[in-house]
From Swiss-Prot:
Co-factor requirement: Ca(2+)
Keyword Zinc-finger tagged: no
Principal cellular location given in the protein's record: secreted
Record's protein name: Phospholipase A2 taicatoxin
Tissue: Expressed by the venom gland.
Single GO biological process annotation from the record: arachidonate secretion
Keywords tagged on the record: Calcium, Calcium-activated potassium channel impairing toxin, Disulfide bond, Hydrolase, Ion channel impairing toxin, Lipid degradation, Lipid metabolism, Metal-binding, Neurotoxin, Potassium channel impairing toxin, Secreted, Toxin
Cell compartment(s), UniProt: Secreted
Catalysed reactions listed for this entry: a 1,2-diacyl-sn-glycero-3-phosphocholine + H2O = a 1-acyl-sn-glycero-3-phosphocholine + a fatty acid + H(+)
Domain of life according to the entry: Eukaryota
Amino acid sequence: NLAQFGFMIRCANGGSRSALDYADYGC
């Protein structure tokens, strides 16, 4: 869905995210 797509974009672009954030976003 759109929310998941947004999370993928954030995962691709955000270098400051923690490992837990990546796991939550499904990346």
